[in-house]
Amino acid sequence: MSRLAECTISDTVDELVQRAKLAEQAERYDDMAGACKTMAEMGNELNNEERNLLSVAYKNVLGARRSSWRIMSSIAKKQAGTPLADQTDIYLKKVEEELIPICNDVLALPVLPITEKIGAEAKIFYYKMMGDYYRYLAEVQEGEQNDKSTEAAEEANQKATSLAEAELSVTHPIRLGLALNFSVFYYEIKNMPEKACSLAKAAFDAAITEVDSIKDETYKDSTLIMQLLRDNLTLWNSECETDS
């Protein structure tokens, strides 16, 4: 990860929010993550806007590395046993050495030891975030490390799901996003397509019956995630039918 923008605790939350927004507009996501990390370290509960900035920043910082890793992993499999195999493995390792510390950086944020003091929506958001970043670790790890990250991802997602089912409407974008990512976890990490389909279908079916009640401010986000759930179900459908 490139050097994050220098932010200090003396910066106010408002200054950090504005800096993060400017960095996002400039697509300087390392700078955005630096501002958001400082904000998270100030000890105050982040509001909805601040949490979303944090999520967007690290998602984009990590996104390019995850894409690179997937490409290099595919190339490495094709080149196994060829003269280029060693060079490809070295490059794949380099990408992993950038990707893993970013995940660990997120998981070490002081907001993630989740306390009873924060609201239900914030708890769900952070448990989901933990589940996502442990999943990203599991994608690139092997052996015991993979087992630990997989277990931690599943545990965090289950906690988030239990809270979401009790506290959020079936059309809430955080609840839908959680269902989307948890189903991807079962499909890609645990190799359980039937479980992935069941989870995604339940979330989509519940939301579609309430689609007319979605609030205007969340309509775009909610319907986009519903479309992603449906796209995955279409993609996974043949495997789910085979496993049934």
From Swiss-Prot:
Transmembrane segments: none annotated. SUPFAM superfamilies: 14-3-3 protein (SSF48445). It comes from the Eukaryota. Gene3D superfamilies: 14-3-3 domain (1.20.190.20). InterPro entries: 14-3-3, 14-3-3_CS, 14-3-3_dom_sf, 14-3-3_domain. Disulfide bonds: none annotated. PANTHER family: 14-3-3 PROTEIN. Belongs to the 14-3-3 family. This is 14-3-3 protein homolog 1. It comes from Echinococcus multilocularis.
